[in-house]
């Protein structure tokens, strides 16, 4: 229900094509013949990522199949770090080799994880990209081994870049402090105003948008801050809207990141990398490489 329009995977399924995602974002209950969903616990840190995946993989018991018939590491620890990508790479190669899906989505995690932790430029980030490069090289080798280049288009791309930050702004902690929302059992229990942070931006919703006094209260609290630019939701271009219609949008200034944490202090020193902000920011640009069937060398 998070998807508002058909994806390319829906269109492929409608044509009777075989689809795979090993893994792919927003894929639970999606149009896939083979699926390792990209999913992890949100609220309960003790909940098992592996168990969540087992509930939604396709065909059912696919994780068990790989754990039993191959050297797949199926421990909870294997859902993080380099081992996660190695496991998913093994699954991707096996599915591709045995089934040759018409359309496959395959996501490598480490570059994003490393940049969130260390920022854009760090030895660990370079290490993560070299690791990802080796996995892409193995995909190219597999397509070559199976003589599939006459039938295969390979696209290597990202969905965003990263922006360095030195400070987290915990907006909902601020709204809680000012009496605009209540917190209990680690979550938000009620609210007059609430923020949906996405790193480089935050979408502010009012429970009663027609309450001019409450609206002005929020404006006074959030405008003219060194850490963010407040924009009326109605003034935002359609291409920059998220989380449905929002009453206000905050765009993070350089060096700041909007976090979902509820703990004080609401201004929290924290270095790393983030995204989710204005896509016109050059640092959020990513790359795209394509090769194979239908791709002309050097063409843009």
Name the predicted role of every residue range.
Residues 96-98, 196, 277-283:
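Short glycine/proline-enriched loop/turn "hinge" motifs that connect secondary-structure elements
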Residues 18-23, 103-107, 154-156, 203-205, ...:
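Structural recognition of the beta-strand scaffold that forms the well-ordered cores
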Residues 24-26, 220-221, 283-300:
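C-terminal accessory region downstream of the catalytic core in glycan-modifying enzymes
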Residues 1-119, 214, 223, 259:
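His/Asp/Glu-rich, glycine-adjacent segments
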Residues 255-295:
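C-terminal, low-complexity/hydrophilic appendages and adjacent surface loops
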Residues 115-133:
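Active-site-proximal segments of metal-dependent phosphoesterases and phosphodiesterases across multiple
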Residues 73-77, 120-122, 186-187, 197-203, ...:
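Flexible glycine/proline-enriched surface loops and loop-helix/loop-strand junctions
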Residues 1, 5, 10, 32, ...:
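Secreted, luminal/periplasmic, and some membrane-associated catalytic domains
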């Amino acid at each position: 229900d998070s998807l508002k329009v058909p994806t390319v995977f829906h269109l492929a399924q409608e044509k009777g094509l075989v689809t795979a995602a090993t893994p792919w974002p927003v894929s639970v209950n999606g149009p896939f013949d083979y699926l390792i969903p990209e999913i992890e616990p949100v609220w309960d840190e003790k909940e098992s990522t592996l168990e969540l995946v087992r509930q939604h993989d396709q065909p059912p018991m696919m994780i068990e199949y790989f754990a039993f018939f191959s050297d797949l590491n199926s421990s909870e620890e294997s859902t993080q770090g380099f081992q996660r990508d190695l496991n998913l790479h093994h699954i991707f190669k096996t599915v591709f080799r045995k089934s040759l899906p018409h359309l496959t989505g395959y996501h490598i995690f480490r570059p994003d994880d490393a940049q969130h932790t260390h920022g854009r430029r760090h030895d660990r980030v370079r290490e993560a990209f070299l690791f990802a490069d080796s996995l892409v090289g193995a995909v190219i080798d597999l397509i070559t081994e199976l003589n599939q280049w006459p039938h295969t288009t390979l696209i290597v791309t990202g969905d965003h870049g990263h922006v360095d930050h030195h400070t987290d702004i915990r907006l909902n902690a601020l709204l809680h402090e000012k009496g605009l929302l209540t917190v209990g059992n680690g979550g938000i229990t009620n609210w007059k105003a609430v923020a949906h942070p996405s790193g480089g931006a935050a979408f502010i919703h009012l429970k009663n948008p027609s309450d001019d006094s409450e609206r002005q209260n929020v404006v006074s609290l959030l405008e003219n801050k060194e850490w963010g630019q407040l924009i009326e939701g109605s003034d935002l271009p359609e291409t920059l809207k998220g989380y449905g219609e929002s009453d206000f949008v905050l765009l993070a200034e350089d060096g700041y990141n909007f976090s979902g944490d509820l703990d004080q202090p609401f201004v929290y020193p924290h270095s790393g990398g983030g995204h989710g902000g204005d896509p016109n920011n050059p640092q959020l640009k990513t790359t795209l490489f394509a090769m194979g069937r239908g791709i002309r060398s050097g063409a843009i």
